[in-house]
Every structure is written in structure tokens, then in C-alpha cells.
Amino acid sequence: MADKLIIFDTTLRDGEQSPGASMTKDEKLRIARQLERLRVDVIEAGFAASSNGDFEAVRAIADVIKESTVCSLARANDRDIARAAEALKSAARSRIHTFIATSELHMEKKLRMTREQVLEQARLSIRFARNLCEDIEFSPEDGYRSDPDFLCRVIEAVINEGATTINVPDTVGYGIPELYGNFIRTLRERVPNSDKAVWSVHCHNDLGMAVANSLAGVKIGGARQIECTINGLGERAGNCSLEEVVMAVRTRRDHFGLEVGIDTTQIVPASRLVSQTTGFIVQPNKAVVGANAFAHASGIHQDGVLKARDTYEIMRAEDVGWSANKIVLGKLSGRNAFKQRLQELGIELESETDVNAAFARFKDLADRKSDIFDEDIIALVGDESVTHEQETYRLLSLEQQSATGERPHAKVAFAVGETEFHAESEGNGPVDASLKAIESKLKSGAEMLLYSVNAITSGSTESQGEVTVRLQHGGRVVNGVGADPDIVVASAKAYLSALNKLHSKNERVAAQG
């Protein structure tokens, strides 16, 4: 029987460290439920000690997830570890993941600690954690750039104290596949008690090799856990992509000889949910989950695929969750048909009240758009009016006028709590005029870093526009997403969505692994 490869998803922790990718508790819950449907082995739900908001998110996820192990990150100190254990108290399966840097650069410049101090702190942190939880993971931060002799001492010590998983991060994405794989193998060969723990890899994508390095760590190094994120989400150039490593191991089972427990038909729904929630659009040519991943434009390729799919396809689109049934509903569709399609898409709303709210949004959209696609449904169930996210700012109505040769003008009505405001402004275009009207009353002081428009579905001018707005204020960066057939309305929704996140998100302590 083939060995099992453990899939450790850190979308909700390391992925969230992407500038603008911060998520609310309810958003994290929705993604965690999808990760469980995906049958991820371990869900790193957050960094419980970083903020009250993250603590509550980890605790809420621990309350509802029953099959996957729920994990919280913690620095190698008693306070962080105790906070993680408290947040995970209700979990059916829990793990504490603690870390401390071991490279000379990090120890000297960041920690200002000697080797012996780091070794002792690592040892004591694992000893303390084992009193609170049986499943303990240890990561030597910047492990790949650490001195191998010292790293072996640290790893041997923490395994002796009870660490059950040893994760060796390439924190800055410096590794090359052959070198990184051999590095993991050398550590496993030199650490006397290496067989007492599962070995894991965590690779960043700064040189574009996170997936290749992770697979080398498994094939050459003998690791049996990969840490990864949906869509490769993560700070800087991102993390190892879950969908890519899973499909690589599954498609090339002849080479890796490993099994993964992932339900691959849930990969595309997970990708869409993370993209819609964070506002990070998936590039069309992204492997496995990009819109063009199974598209064939060349006539020769098209002819070959029509005759035999395996001429140019090594995977089947439906195996990763792409549906051939695109047009699903219309304005005559009833509530039961809508609810059934939600289930088919893997969308789980918390109550019948939420289903009713989503159906009301669907009927409103169907009155304005003849064909409703899966992507439209995914966008509308993420709307704050459906999810009951805390809405300090809420769009009520928008009217805009523009004509050739005239300066566009917009009138906007919106609510701040229970107070209604009316504002109007001119601008360089209808979107600019609308957002200036909102700012004329709010005076938020936020700086816009990004404005982008993406067609939710292609091939028709009826398509909804999905707008992402990235704002920065007080050192925090957030994304807001809005969808509507009218891109001016979508823009106002996205802007207010971002302001809601700025208003509600707690300060965080950054963690890197």
C-alpha cells in the first residue's frame, strides 16, 4: 500500500499574510468548511495569539470542523502556546504549530539570541506544548538557510521533547529543487531520532519553485507532509500551490508512489471561493484552476482532443471540479432549484434565513440578467447582505450621468450604521464620481492601492463585473470585492466593502514560516 502524503493547508494563516488578503471570521469559516469538503488533512486556521479577532476565528473553526485537524500557529513562548491551546479547546482534532528562527541572520538580527538560547527556548516550548496538546509541530523559521549542524541539534532536541511533526521551511524561497530535496534528506539521515516524527516541507515561491521544491522535499528528502495554500496565496510571490502539488502527486503516482486523501472535485470550488473572498484573481493560465487550464485554441490540439482527450490532456477537467454545465438558472427558477445548485457547488449556508437572503439576491440578479452562471452564484453568496458580515457602511442607491464631452456626475445614497447619507460629485468617469461622492461624506483618509475589474463570466456583455478595491490606512491593507451587472454599482460596493474591513479588522502580529 502506498504511503499517505499529508496535505497541510495554510490559506487561512500564511495565505492571509498577502497584503489585502485579510479575512473576517465569517469568511474564514466559509473557507474552512470548503477545505474540509476538500478533505484537507490539516487546516492551519490562524495565529491565535496575534489578535482577539484571530483567536475568535480559530476558536470558531475549531467548533465546526470535525474531520480535518485544526491547527494554530504560535511563537515559541508559553503565552502564545497557551493562547493557541485555548482557541483549539473544542476541536475534534487539534494541533499546535510552534516556531522559532534558527538561521544566523534571524537569530542575530531579529531575535538577538545566541544559538544556545534558541535551542533552549525551542526545547522548553515543545515541553510546555505537549502538556496541552498531543499533536505538536515544530518549524525552525528560515530553516533552509540555517547551519545544518545546529539545525540537527535543534530538531533532535524538540523530537526528544515530543514534537510529532518537523517542518523545514524555505522561508524566503531561496531553494533549488535538487538542493532543497537533498537538504531534507541530509537532515533526516543525521538526526538520530528522525523516525519519531513526520517530516514536512513549507516552500515560498520567490524564485517560482515552491511547488518543485516541495515535491523534491517529498521525493528526494522523504518528507510526508506538504504545507500549501489554495491558489498559491501568500505574501510576496506566494506559497506552494495546493492544487498543483495534489494533482502532480495524483497524476504522477507512478513517480511519487504516494496517495493523497483529497477530493479533487472540490479543488475548483475552493479556488473560486478563495479568489472571490480575497479579491485575488486567478490568472487564466494558472495550472489546474486557471480559466484556460483545459482550453485548446490550436486547431491541431482541438482535433486531437475531439478524437481522444488524452492526446493533449493529462487530467480531466471534471476531476478537479470544472463543470461542463455552465448555464444553470434563470428568472423562472425556484428556490428549490437554487438551493440544489448551491449544494452541487459545495456552498453551505448556515441557515434557512441565509438561503432566503441569497435567493432574494438571485431573483434580483435574474431580473437584470437572463442567464445565471455558477460564477454568478458564487459571487452573490459572498455578498455581505447574505453573509451577515458586520456592515458599518452599506450602499442604498446610486445614480450617475455621463455623456460625450460632459463631465460625469454621480449621486449616491449609503448608510453608516442606521444613519442615511446622500452625496453627489463629479469625476473623471462615473466610477471616479461615485467614489468621490462617498468620500465627500466619509473622509476616510484611506489610500487606494488597487482598482481592478474582472468579468465574472465571459462571452456576453450581460456578465456581472467583479470589482476589487485595495485600500491602505493606518498601516493596514485590505481588499474589498463587489459584484453587479453595473460596474459602477460594483465599484461602490467594493469600496464600501473595503471600508467595512478597515473599520472592523483588528491589528495583527505578522508571522512568517
From Swiss-Prot:
Enzyme class: transferase
Region (Regulatory domain): 394-513
Disulfide bonds: none
GO molecular function terms attached to this record: 2-isopropylmalate synthase activity; acetyl-CoA C-acetyltransferase activity; manganese ion binding
Alphabetical list of SUPFAM superfamilies matching this protein: 2-isopropylmalate synthase LeuA, allosteric (dimerisation) domain, Aldolase
Pathway this chain belongs to: Amino-acid biosynthesis; L-leucine biosynthesis; L-leucine from 3-methyl-2-oxobutanoate: step 1/4
Binding, Mn(2+): D14, H202, H204, N239
Keywords annotated in UniProt: Amino-acid biosynthesis, Branched-chain amino acid biosynthesis, Cytoplasm, Leucine biosynthesis, Manganese, Metal-binding, Transferase
CDD domains referenced in this protein's UniProt entry, alphabetically: DRE_TIM_IPMS
Catalytic activity: 3-methyl-2-oxobutanoate + acetyl-CoA + H2O = (2S)-2-isopropylmalate + CoA + H(+)
Cellular localisation: Cytoplasm
A GO cellular component entry from the record: cytosol
EC nos: 2.3.3.13
Cofactor dependence: Mn(2+)
Domain Pyruvate carboxyltransferase, residue spans: 5-268
GO biological process: L-leucine biosynthetic process
Coiled coil: none
Claim: Transferase is one of the keywords in the record: yes
PROSITE patterns attached to this UniProt entry: AIPM_HOMOCIT_SYNTH_1 (PS00815), AIPM_HOMOCIT_SYNTH_2 (PS00816), PYR_CT (PS50991)
SMART domains named among the record's database cross-references: LeuA_dimer (SM00917)
Family: Belongs to the alpha-IPM synthase/homocitrate synthase family. LeuA type 1 subfamily.
HAMAP family: LeuA_type1 (MF_01025)
UniProt subunit comment: Homodimer.
Function, in words: Catalyzes the condensation of the acetyl group of acetyl-CoA with 3-methyl-2-oxobutanoate (2-ketoisovalerate) to form 3-carboxy-3-hydroxy-4-methylpentanoate (2-isopropylmalate).
Name by which UniProt lists this protein: 2-isopropylmalate synthase
Organism whose genome encodes this protein: Methylibium petroleiphilum (strain ATCC BAA-1232 / LMG 22953 / PM1)
Origin organism lineage: Bacteria, Pseudomonadati, Pseudomonadota, Betaproteobacteria, Burkholderiales
